[in-house]
Swiss-Prot record:
GO terms for biological process: amino acid biosynthetic process; aromatic amino acid family biosynthetic process; chorismate biosynthetic process. It is an enzyme of class 4 (lyase). The gene is aroB. The keyword Chloroplast does not apply. Its main location: cytoplasm. Zn(2+) binds at E184, H247, H264. GO terms for molecular function: 3-dehydroquinate synthase activity; metal ion binding; nucleotide binding. GO terms for cellular component: cytoplasm. Keywords: Amino-acid biosynthesis, Aromatic amino acid biosynthesis, Cobalt, Cytoplasm, Lyase, Metal-binding, NAD, Nucleotide-binding, Zinc. NAD(+) binds at residues 71-76, 105-109, 129-130, 142, 151, 169-172. This is 3-dehydroquinate synthase. Binds 1 divalent metal cation per subunit. Can use either Co(2+) or Zn(2+).
Length: 361
């Protein structure tokens, strides 16, 4: 069992990583006998985990209700969020309740925002079931729902009480979702840890084969890297923005194409290559390292370019609504060298368009 702490003073919390954690109600700290909880999941995961987890928590003396939401990024909306509030109110949950987010990034973001909002804030536990949510979205307290004009535009910074990562969940993960998660894994190597990037080059096939030791190390290292960044910059005023490598381009793809048509990691992978091409045009990040990034993303089953039906100019309106835009100036996360990145302010529109075209060639 691995345990990492996200250090945020009195709001610090543990990340626990092991196989079989969902079989042990004690994993869901700080829930104790006599507590009430609302388990939030989706209709794809409910048949796999819902009944057994509710039964184990009930046997441990926790009063558990549940709400099952429709699966998919297109359902990360205010309308679906209201279903969580309705379930909480219908079952008379008060400020002493705990929400359990059992699912991938959509459920984690949505249930976390529900917890931040319900009665001005209740406790919640992240129980991520996808690789992407285990290595990224469950850690750090970003919660949100989407708007038709932009991804994650309505939300709050709100930290969980704990993160419970059961490695066994990955055994039921579709291959496309696994590849999507690997995009976020590779991101950490590009922006923060060149040695980890090299480890990924050596161990990618083991990860794709769901080799337990490789997965455990990979997830632990990603969580360590993100925990350090969040501890230093919780509200994304500086270093934390680096975690958005590829996301400004990627969110444009997700929004333009309709939520759910491109998985988040698929869009981020394309966005990372666009950021790499922009960095090359600005005279940073070597051709050799750009080729290493491209090769690793391809081995992970990820695309190097955006949708064929999306013109380069289509990206710009979406990118200008990005949360990193300040005073009408676009800010892009760009790699400098492998393991290092920067936030570049005022990247010209023609440079953005050229970087997208470079990935279409």
């Amino acid at each position: 069992m691995e345990r990492i702490t996200v250090t945020l003073g009195e709001r610090s919390y543990p990340i626990t990583i092991a196989a079989g954690l969902f079989n042990d109600p004690a994993s869901f700290w700080p829930l104790t006998r006599g507590d009430s909880a609302m388990l939030v999941t989706n209709d794809r995961l409910a048949p796999l985990y819902l009944e057994s987890l509710c039964e184990r928590l009930t046997q441990a003396g926790v009063k558990v209700d549940r709400v099952v939401l429709p699966d998919g990024e297109q359902n990360k909306s205010l309308t679906v969020l209201d279903q969580v509030f309705t379930a909480l109110l219908a079952k008379s949950h008060g400020r002493d309740t705990t929400l359990i987010a059992l699912g991938g990034g959509v459920i984690g973001d949505l249930a976390g925002f529900a917890a931040a909002s319900y009665q001005r804030g209740v406790r919640f536990i992240q129980a991520p079931t996808t690789l992407l949510s285990q290595v990224d979205s469950s850690v750090g307290g970003k919660t949100a729902v989407n708007h038709s004009l932009g991804k994650n535009m309505i939300g709050a910074f709100y930290q969980p009480a704990s993160v419970v990562i059961d490695l066994d969940c990955l055994n039921t993960l579709p291959r496309r979702e696994l590849s999507s998660g690997l995009a976020e894994v590779i991101k950490y190597g590009i922006i923060l840890d060149a040695a980890f990037f090299a480890w990924l080059e050596d161990n990618l096939e083991a990860l794709l084969a769901l080799e337990p030791q490789a997965l455990a190390y990979c997830i632990r290292r990603c969580c360590e890297l993100k925990a350090d960044v969040v501890a230093a910059d919780e509200r994304e005023q500086g270093q934390r923005a680096l975690l958005n490598l590829g996301h400004t381009y990627g969110h444009a793809i997700e929004t333009h194409m309709g939520y759910g048509n491109w998985l988040h990691g698929e869009a981020v992978a394309a966005g990372m290559m666009m950021a790499v091409r922009a960095a090359r045009r600005l005279g940073q990040f070597s051709d050799a390292d750009a080729e290493r990034v491209s090769a690793l993303l391809q081995r992970a089953g990820l695309t190097m370019s955006g949708p064929a039906e999306m013109a380069p100019e289509d990206y710009l309106p979406h990118m200008m609504r990005d949360k990193k835009v300040i005073a009408g100036r676009l800010r892009l996360v760009l790699p400098v060298t492998l393991g290092n990145a920067e936030v570049r302010t005022g990247v010209a529109d023609d440079m953005v368009v050229a970087s997208i075209k470079d990935c279409q060639a």
